[in-house]
């Protein structure tokens, strides 16, 4: 974000007040980004009425973007935020470090997530495997925070977790190397809304599983999956929202209409409340409709896998389905973003602005929990390495808990 020299700021403030002349255009170079933020907030911000008056913010328009935003947003607002517009290159890999020797400074990284189209995905790295070495060098306390920070290509030594327990009950843990993975350099890649899905059999139940990281009204994978699940006789669905952070309200409507009981179709899913300026261009409510080209699965219950990363519209989906069907949460507490947001991009300033614009309530007028939803069945995602398995594996920690719950 920008920095403004102190002396220059003093000169500008003096000139702004000189001769009663409007000199704002002359200083747009220094204030334009914050004026853009201000203009959006005064039109769309949920708490627009509580914003300081324009004349009270004269000095603040010359501040950094973050400083300006903290000055004008409502104190209860923990969601409105700024980010760089540029997509950042990535390996598409998440991991959790663990010390694997009590006597030596040896660590390994347990892979917890892999994006399919990423360098990690292309290298064939799977969730639940372990990174033991990078280019032949071990992971230690000294390099544990930097061993994959340079963004370059590397040759990873991959391992598998193994436990042995002797007759006296003493457990020994091994990470056994089994393959090399050529990890390409960080890059910008296309993310997939629904990266993993499958159909499982659990007792007399046909279970449809889908890892849904984002849903929009244009998420075609949801439509095709609904038809696949219907054709294969799926009568239970496990919806994995552990990594769902950036969905849309029309996507919520589509997914809810696929999952809900047929008796709920035509009923209100969600109601919106905007600021006092009202916005006729935005919908005031969303209705459960028979999805165009998709199948309604007519489910009485949906099992939702959650984590601390589950946020925003994903939480509204949980909340707005509850009046219509049984929603069983398994995993961890969700983040707790109880408002709807809009994202605005500005290429001139290289900024992406995520702005709270509405209160969302379910059909009974109930808002999502500001502190997040606590799970009905609390399960740690990674505490048992033997259950950190590829998504959709029946032995994976959260999915196995969901199957146990639906068959008990």
Task: Describe the predicted segments one by one.
Residues 1-36, 44, 52:
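Bacterial Sec-dependent N-terminal signal peptides
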Residues 135-234:
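C-terminal, low-ordered peptide segments at domain boundaries
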Residues 37, 93, 120, 128-131, ...:
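Terminal peptide-recognition signature
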Residues 105-106, 123-125, 142-145, 249-253, ...:
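Short, solvent-exposed loop/turn and secondary-structure capping segments
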Residues 87-133, 137-140, 216-220:
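PDZ/PDZ-like domain segments forming the peptide/carboxylate-binding groove
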Residues 210, 217, 222-224, 229, ...:
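C-terminal "post-core" interaction segments
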Residues 27-109, 153, 160-194:
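Extended, small/polar residue-biased N-terminal targeting/export presequences
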Residues 88-92, 106-108, 126, 151-153, ...:
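Extracytoplasmic
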């Amino acid at each position: 974000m920008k920095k403004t020299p102190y002396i220059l700021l003093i000169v500008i403030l003096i000139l702004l007040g000189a001769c009663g002349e409007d000199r704002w255009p002359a200083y747009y170079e220094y204030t334009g980004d914050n004026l853009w933020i201000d203009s959006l907030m005064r039109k769309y911000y949920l708490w627009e009425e509580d914003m300081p008056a324009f004349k009270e913010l004269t000095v603040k328009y010359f501040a950094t973007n973050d400083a300006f935003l903290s000055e004008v947003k409502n104190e209860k607002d923990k969601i409105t935020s700024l980010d760089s517009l540029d997509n950042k290159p990535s390996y598409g890999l998440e991991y959790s470090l663990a010390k694997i020797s009590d006597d030596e400074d040896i660590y390994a990284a347990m892979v917890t997530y892999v994006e399919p189209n990423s360098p990690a995905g292309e290298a064939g790295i799977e969730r639940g495997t372990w990174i033991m070495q990078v280019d032949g060098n071990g992971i230690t306390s000294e390099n544990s925070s930097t061993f994959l920070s340079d963004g370059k290509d590397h040759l990873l030594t991959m391992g598998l977790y193994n436990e042995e327990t002797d007759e006296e009950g003493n457990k020994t843990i091994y990470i056994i190397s089994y393959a090399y993975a050529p990890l390409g350099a960080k890059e910008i890649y296309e993310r997939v809304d629904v990266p993993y899905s499958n159909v499982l059999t659990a007792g007399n139940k046909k279970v449809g599983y889908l890892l849904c990281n984002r849903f929009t009204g244009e998420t075609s994978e949801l439509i095709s999956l609904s038809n696949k699940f219907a054709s294969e006789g799926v009568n239970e669905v496990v919806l994995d929202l552990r990594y769902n952070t950036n969905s849309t309200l029309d996507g919520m409507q589509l997914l809810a209409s696929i999952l809900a009981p047929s008796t709920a179709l035509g009923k209100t899913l969600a109601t919106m409340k905007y600021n006092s300026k009202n916005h006729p261009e935005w919908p005031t409510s969303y209705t459960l409709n028979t999805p165009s080209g998709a199948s309604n699965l007519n489910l009485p219950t949906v099992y939702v896998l959650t984590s601390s990363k589950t946020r925003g519209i994903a939480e509204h989906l949980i909340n707005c389905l509850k009046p219509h069907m049984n929603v069983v949460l398994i995993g961890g507490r969700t983040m707790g973003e109880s408002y709807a947001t809009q994202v605005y991009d500005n290429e001139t300033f290289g900024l992406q602005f995520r702005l709270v614009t509405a209160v969302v309530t379910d059909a009974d007028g109930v808002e999502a929990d500001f502190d997040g939803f606590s799970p009905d069945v609390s399960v740690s995602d990674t505490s048992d390495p033997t259950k950190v398995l590829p998504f959709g594996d029946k032995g994976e920690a959260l999915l196995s808990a969901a199957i146990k719950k639906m068959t008990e």
